[in-house]
Design a protein with these regions (language model features):
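Position-driven detector of the extreme protein N-terminus
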Residues: 2-5
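Alpha/propeptide regions of enzymes that mature by internal proteolysis
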Residues: 7-387
Length: 387
């Protein structure tokens, strides 16, 4: 249920912000949390106003760390427009966020906030309850341009510099229970594990290496605990009920947000090019290889390639082929084991499409992707010639 309120040249009294003045702002009520806190959307920002005392742990550069005096937390889409870069209101990111907090009617000293390039209308909100305990996740996210794997090569070093790459997964996690600061920190670990689990279950690839993504390069998280609650917990790990609720809630919300923002979901991932993107295999790379065999119009080729890319047999065998390569790169299988299994898979794919198989010369990313690409091209070429 939404609460649309048009505000024009009038003073507006909000929870904890009685002296705030807004002009021309539209407020939409998104959700009321079990804590009594309320989430609103103000155009390109989502603000959660606290009804009482809260413990907050934030990874944000702006007023991050552990605090017990905050009145609200927020998430802001900094893009000027769709597909455009984020607008900077000051020379530093911290000052930019301070100015932004004032613009949306907050007291900068009493809030923490996160910036993103994700659209606020694509927010996903999930909540789970066990007995008296409720956990709520408010998530925006997109990793198509900035998804990476921890340990990937990086180009950002200066402590005061703000990376300009976009595509963050921002999480506001609200725990309707009191807890010591250490447990709040443990909840952050569990929350991060859940985010990574969601991404890996979608087999989203890194944009900076051949690995599976574990997040984006600029993910941020805010954890909120209810200091006023009679419930008091000292555990938020995977063996605790709170940890279970955090895991399930965050995983579901992250998947929903990625689907809304980027179209990243099981349906779109049912395509070999989506799975092979991290290995630099694309329709364009296949087209360049195909041109050496047949003179066919590119639109006709692309239609045939996309159709083949989504066929169950091609996707299933290719998925196994990719996982062999992953396990080789992780040191779990040696070259002989991978060579033997990969050649069998290439032969099986060829047999399914009545095409001559391709020999695999060595086990490496380049060699395995070359062999697969040549086989894929041969299948398309043979199909065209048969028809």
């Amino acid at each position: 249920m939404t609460d649309m309120i048009g505000i024009k040249n009038i003073s507006v009294f909000l929870p904890g912000q009685e002296d705030t003045f807004f002009t021309g702002v539209v407020r939409m009520k998104l959700y009321t949390v079990s804590t009594g806190d309320t989430a609103y959307r103000y155009e390109k920002s989502i603000v959660v106003f606290f009804k009482g005392a809260r413990k907050v742990l934030s990874t944000s550069v702006f007023n991050g760390g552990y605090h017990e005096n905050y009145k609200a937390v927020f998430n802001h889409d900094g893009k000027v427009g769709s597909g455009m870069p984020c607008e900077m209101l000051a020379d530093t990111y911290t000052e930019h966020m301070r100015i932004l907090a004032k613009r949306i009617g907050l007291e900068p000293e009493l809030v923490t906030g996160m910036g993103t390039a994700a659209d606020m209308e694509n927010v996903a909100i999930e909540s789970l309850t066990y007995k008296e305990l409720t956990v709520t996740a408010i998530v925006t996210g997109g990793i198509e341009t900035n998804g990476g794997r921890v340990g990937d090569p990086a180009d950002y070093y200066k402590p005061a510099e703000k990376p300009d790459k976009l595509g963050t997964i921002n999480i506001i996690l609200i725990l309707d229970a009191d807890m010591p600061p250490g447990t709040l920190a443990r909840a952050l670990v569990t929350c991060t594990e859940a985010k990574t689990a969601a991404i890996q279950e979608l087999l989203a690839g890194s944009n900076y290496s051949t690995g599976l993504a574990t997040g984006s390069g600029t993910d941020q998280t805010i954890i909120v605990a209810n200091s006023d609650s009679a419930l008091y917990f000292e555990g938020a790990g995977k063996h605790s009920k709170m940890g279970e609720l955090i895991g399930k809630t965050v995983t579901k919300a992250v998947k929903a947000a990625l689907s809304k923002q980027s179209g990243l979901n099981p349906k779109t991932q049912h395509n070999v090019f989506r799975r092979l993107k991290r290995f630099q295999v694309t329709t364009q790379s296949i087209w360049l290889l195909f041109q050496q065999q047949l003179a066919v119009l590119k639109p006709d080729f692309l239609e045939a390639a996309e159709k083949l890319a989504q066929e169950p047999v091609m996707l299933t065998y290719t998925s196994l082929y990719i996982h062999l390569l992953d396990q080789f790169l992780w040191g779990l299988l040696d070259k002989d084991e991978v060579m033997n299994a990969a050649e069998k898979l290439l032969s099986d794919i060829a047999g399914e499409y009545d095409t001559e198989s391709i020999a695999l010369n060595e086990v490496s990313v380049e060699a395995m992707m070359k062999a697969w690409s040549e086989l894929f091209v041969n299948i398309i070429a043979d199909n065209i010639q048969r028809n």
